UniProtKB/Swiss-Prot annotation:
GO molecular function list: ribosome binding; RNA binding; translation elongation factor activity; translation initiation factor activity
Protein name as it appears in the record: Translation initiation factor 5A
SMART domains registered for this protein in UniProt: eIF-5a
Protein family: Belongs to the eIF-5A family.
Gene3D superfamilies: 2.30.30.30, Nucleic acid-binding proteins (2.40.50.140)
Organism: Methanoculleus marisnigri (strain ATCC 35101 / DSM 1498 / JR1)
Residues the record lists as Hypusine modifications: K35
Known role: Functions by promoting the formation of the first peptide bond.
Pfam families for this protein: IF5A-like_N (PF21485)
Length: 125
């Protein structure tokens, strides 16, 4: 899910949707309005799920989308290689995530772990 907001209201550390990917804002630079133009903002951000650096330039008064990022808890059901099967603690939704070798080392069946969910994607914190 996502909601609309003005570019001028965004702040560092918050989230924005760029190229249909939820991103965390790293820096914002705003230029002064010119004789015939409006003020513009340059937003540098990093994707939450893919880690790719992205930047956009938009007028301060333009509307943009802000993702709703949810932090939830899940219980580890099983581990098969780098694929972990998890169950959400609140709504008992079952799903699988591919994780790194380092993340698998700290997991064991029955353990509760936090994860991030936004725009239909999920990732371990």
């Amino acid at each position: 899910m996502k909601e609309q907001t003005e570019v001028g209201k965004l702040k560092e550390g918050r989230y924005v949707v760029v190229e249909d990917e939820p991103c965390r804002i790293v820096s914002i630079a705003t230029s002064k309005p010119g004789k015939h133009g409006a003020a513009k903002s340059r937003i540098d951000c990093i994707g939450i799920f893919d880690g790719v650096k992205r930047s956009i330039v938009q007028p301060v008064s333009a509307k943009t989308y802000v993702p709703i990022v949810e932090r939830k808890m899940a219980q580890v059901i099983s581990i098969a290689g780098t694929t972990v099967q998890l169950m959400d603690v609140k709504d008992f939704d079952m799903f699988e995530l591919n994780v790194t070798e380092e993340q698998v080392a700290g997991l064991e069946p029955g353990k509760e772990i936090p994860y991030i969910s936004s725009l239909g994607k999920k990732k371990l914190e």
